Design a protein with these regions (language model features):
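Disulfide-rich, cysteine-dense extracellular ectodomains and adjacent flexible linkers of secreted
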Residues: 1-183
Length: 183
């Protein structure tokens, strides 16, 4: 750009774009430079709108930047932190998603499998312990000790401890509903 009265052109600074006397973006006959605003990126004196989903462009950007893990970018002008129970593990996330059933998300950047004796519904921040006299099930309702999504009451004829469901098998014993041992 050439400021009024200058004999030689001045290179446009990194993160800036060139404008004419009316502050309109131009590539020729530029008289000044302006700082690249948030939501745009500027390179070689030109200003471009940041339009790629999952990216953002802070002030003085020279290119779109992927939204960092643990956050998401609905618009290129802002980064939004994911809430607990949401999952934003990868960079470039456009929208958060709830933590998957069978997993928990103590931090938005990680999704951990539920351990034995616990279950995790969709969006769980932490695992929920299986209650006494109950057993854990997968998404199809089948008994499981890993990646459980819910708990069910222990039916008659079974005893349930630590999320496990075991049939009563000793002769002369029975197991009423919610049993934790053979009686």
């Amino acid at each position: 750009f050439c400021e009024e009265g200058s004999e030689l052109p001045t290179g446009v600074s990194v993160g800036h774009y060139s404008v004419d006397a009316a502050n309109e973006t131009v590539s020729n006959a530029a008289v000044a430079e302006l700082s690249c605003p948030s939501g745009s990126y500027c390179s070689g004196g030109a200003k471009e709108e940041c339009t790629t989903l999952g990216t953002y462009c802070p002030e003085q950007s020279t290119e779109p930047v992927a939204c960092p893990a643990g956050s998401y970018c609905r618009t290129p002008a802002e980064i939004i932190d994911c809430d607990a129970g949401q999952h934003c593990e990868e960079s470039g996330t456009e929208e958060p998603r709830l933590c998957s059933a069978g997993y928990y998300c103590a931090t938005p950047a990680s999704e951990e499998e539920c351990d034995s004796g616990t279950f995790c519904a969709e969006g769980n921040v932490l695992p929920t312990g299986v209650r006494v006299g109950h057993y854990s099930v997968d998404a199809s309702g089948n008994p499981t000790l890993s990646m459980a999504v819910a708990e069910l009451p222990c039916p008659a004829g079974f005893f349930c401890v630590g999320g496990d469901k075991t049939a009563c098998g000793t002769s002369g014993t029975f197991c009423p509903e919610l049993s934790t041992e053979e009686v």
